[in-house]
């Protein structure tokens, strides 16, 4: 089956309904090679399949994918989830986190403006970062993340993979750091799917009760969503 070009993908479906923007910010540096990147690819692709079994979530969810190693790449701009193509990410290179975080912030800001111009009410967007490495100097971009969260513009949290730099992720996300035990991303991406479903049956601005985390992920996240 031939892949669609981005020009063939509608910018939004059901514009009269509230919409949710979810951006996956994914570390594809060399240390993610082998089982980690293979599991991540399979789990991202399964996430799309799971979301699309629920008509309501499919209707309101737009997803973007940004990867980073020593460079930042927008693998997929914000796209209605039903139009996601399978990913086949390849791990290589070093880790430079700050530029990728800034790209993610800019994309979320632009998506929020797009919703406003379309007359679409937005849910608070999520940036979900997955990383196993040391990200370099993130002090400046961390301040931007904290300010945007404090102002109520987004939720930014991260999943640390085996060997991750805890100090870096906590500097960026505060308490909103999850820890993955092992390299199986299936459970956490299923959690993301169920979280999007919980958002989809809420009203924008309403506190959402999130599902329990999978057994191989540590942290209780519900206090983050006040």
Where are these regions (language model features)?
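Acidic, polar low-complexity linker/tail segments
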Residues: 1-23, 28-38, 52, 112-117
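Arginine/glycine-rich "motif VI" loop of SF2 helicases in the C-terminal RecA-like domain
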Residues: 55-56, 146-154
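Mixed-charge (Asp/Glu-Lys/Arg
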Residues: 29, 135, 141-147
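An active-site-proximal "capping" alpha-helix that borders the catalytic cofactor pocket
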Residues: 40-52
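Von Willebrand factor A/integrin I-like adhesion domains
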Residues: 158, 162-225
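Short, charge-patterned binding micro-sites
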Residues: 62-88
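Von Willebrand factor
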Residues: 73, 83-123, 135-137, 155-169, ...
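DG-centered beta-turn motif at the end of beta-strands
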Residues: 26-29, 40, 65, 104, ...
């Amino acid at each position: 089956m031939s892949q669609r070009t981005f020009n063939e993908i509608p910018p939004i479906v059901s514009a009269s309904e509230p919409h949710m923007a979810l951006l996956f910010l994914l570390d594809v540096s060399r240390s993610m090679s082998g089982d980690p990147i293979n599991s991540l690819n399979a789990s991202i692709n399964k996430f799309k399949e799971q979301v699309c079994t629920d008509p309501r979530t499919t209707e309101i969810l737009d997803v973007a994918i940004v990867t980073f190693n020593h460079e930042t790449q927008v693998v997929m701009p914000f796209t209605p989830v039903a139009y996601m193509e399978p990913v086949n990410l390849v791990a290589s290179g070093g880790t430079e986190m700050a530029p990728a975080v800034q790209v993610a912030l800019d994309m979320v800001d632009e998506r929020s403006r797009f919703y406003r111009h379309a007359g679409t009410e937005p849910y608070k967007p999520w940036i979900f970062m997955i990383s196993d490495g040391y990200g370099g100097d993130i002090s400046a971009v961390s301040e931007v993340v904290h300010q945007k969260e404090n102002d109520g513009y987004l939720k930014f949290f991260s999943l640390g993979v085996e060997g991750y730099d805890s100090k870096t992720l906590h500097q960026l996300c505060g308490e909103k750091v999850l820890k993955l035990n092992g390299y199986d991303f299936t459970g956490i991406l299923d959690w993301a799917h169920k979280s999007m479903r919980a958002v989809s049956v809420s009203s924008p601005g309403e506190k959402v009760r999130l599902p329990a985390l999978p057994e191989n992920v540590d942290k209780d996240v519900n206090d983050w969503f006040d």
